[in-house]
Amino acid sequence: MKFELFREVALTRDFPEHQLRAGDVATLVDFVPHPSGGENGCVLEISNAVGKTIAVITAPLSAIEPLGPNEILTVRSLAPTANVPA
């Protein structure tokens, strides 16, 4: 599947180290080639409900999917951590 930069995508798996869950929405900001020919990756920016960036992560391309026209966004709480700016 071909993804476009700066489009919103959904995570297909959890990233517990960042308190992110499958279904969370992220913005695709860059592509990252695998250094030894494995699965390529991407850089994702995750924002809170008011648009403030709370994380920037790298993930394999298989960990994202495009948003679909039959999907709606939901809101969930993110427990505060030392990595999340107030």
Segments and roles (model prediction):
Residues F3-L67, I72-V75, A79-P80, A86:
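Basic/aromatic-rich interaction segments and small domains that mediate binding to polyanionic partners
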